[in-house]
Amino acid sequence: MAALPVLVLVLLLACGGPRAAGQKRKEMVLSEKVSQLMEWTSKRSVIRMNGDKFRRLVKAPPRNYSVIVMFTALQPHRQCVVCKQADEEYQVLANSWRYSSAFTNKIFFAMVDFDEGSDVFQMLNMNSAPTFINFPAKGKPKRGDTYELQVRGFAAEQLARWVADRTDVNIRVIRPPNYAGPLMLGLLLAVIGGLVYLRGSNLDFLYNKTGWAFAALCFVLAMTSGQMWNHIRGPPYAHKNPHTGQVNYIHGSSQAQFVAETHIVLLFNGGVTLGMVLLHEAATSDMDVGKRKIMCIAGIGLVVFFFSWLLSVFRSKYHGYPYSFLMS
């Protein structure tokens, strides 16, 4: 009977020993991975990864940290303009986190270039770039862990909101100082001051109705075409299909747009406006009847042509819209 407690103790040690050793080995592997990531982050805010690094540090357990990965194609022969623009914003976000007082080892920023890790693209069945995915500390990425680039754009502030939503890590985006705005404002003030100085005795140009009307028209066209949305969201200029090479300038959803789409809509609105101006001049001017007829026909043609195109763009974004005019 005295040997029974000793036997039980031996059995417990025999069962718990391997488990404890495995747990200790797991903690050592995790510590090595975190130390390696921290060392790379201290040198570069965005860690460049190939297939081996991605599988070992992002996919393979154990892991108690989240990794935000940008899948991109930055090599010049890929001709991915959007990738370069998105990379600049991603670098701003990663640098803001790296130099933040709240920096911890709970989240890291990484990048996989197609030419350095094409096997990773194949493993994830990924066929477009740039793409942002959050690999959480526990479990596999869910649907919300893939960033909706076409809807939100790639501005660092938008990425920071998405990161906060997926990881509960709030990053205050700090951009490098941009002196372009103050310089342009100073140049504008200098031009205005120069005009006032040179024509101080004659300021009739300030009361020029045509000039003010043209300036107001430019402002209205810019605002109605979606320039302010672009400024806030920072969408890509266009989207190039990596397989077919086809470039899309019109976004297929009503919830997003490309910068090129703004320029197209501005052009169409400008064409309609020009047509209306010609119709007004044809009806009110004192020119001979022949010229007024030409202006009237040209005005009607511009309004019909550009309005049809504008309605066609609207139909392509709002699927199921029943009305069209000349163009489907």
UniProtKB/Swiss-Prot annotation:
Record keyword Disulfide bond present: yes
Organism annotation: Gallus gallus
Coiled-coil ranges (or none): none
CDD domains in UniProt: TRX_family
Family per similarity comment: Belongs to the OST3/OST6 family.
Record's signal peptide: 1-22
Pathway: Protein modification; protein glycosylation
Cytoplasmic side: 199-211, 279-293
Sorted UniProt keywords: Cell membrane, Disulfide bond, Endoplasmic reticulum, Glycoprotein, Magnesium, Membrane, Signal, Transmembrane, Transmembrane helix, Transport
Protein name per its UniProtKB record: Dolichyl-diphosphooligosaccharide--protein glycosyltransferase subunit MAGT1
Gene3D superfamilies the UniProt entry points to: Glutaredoxin (3.40.30.10)
PANTHER family on file: DOLICHYL-DIPHOSPHOOLIGOSACCHARIDE--PROTEIN GLYCOSYLTRANSFERASE-RELATED, MAGNESIUM TRANSPORTER PROTEIN 1
Any one annotated GO CC term: oligosaccharyltransferase complex
Short name of any one Pfam family annotated for the protein: OST3_OST6
InterPro entries: OligosaccharylTrfase_OST3/OST6, Thioredoxin-like_sf
Functional note: Accessory component of the STT3B-containing form of the N-oligosaccharyl transferase (OST) complex which catalyzes the transfer of a high mannose oligosaccharide from a lipid-linked oligosaccharide donor to an asparagine residue within an Asn-X-Ser/Thr consensus motif in nascent polypeptide chains. Involved in N-glycosylation of STT3B-dependent substrates. Specifically required for the glycosylation of a subset of acceptor sites that are near cysteine residues; in this function seems to act redundantly with TUSC3.
Residue stretches spanning the membrane: 178-198, 212-232, 258-278, 294-314
Membrane topology: Multi-pass membrane protein
Intrachain S-S bonds: C80-C83
Glycosylation sites: N64
Keyword Magnesium: yes
Record topological domains on the Extracellular side: 23-177, 233-257, 315-328
Localization terms from the record: Cell membrane; Endoplasmic reticulum; Endoplasmic reticulum membrane
The protein's assembly and partners: Accessory component of the STT3B-containing form of the oligosaccharyltransferase (OST) complex. OST exists in two different complex forms which contain common core subunits RPN1, RPN2, OST48, OST4, DAD1 and TMEM258, either STT3A or STT3B as catalytic subunits, and form-specific accessory subunits. OST can form stable complexes with the Sec61 complex or with both the Sec61 and TRAP complexes.
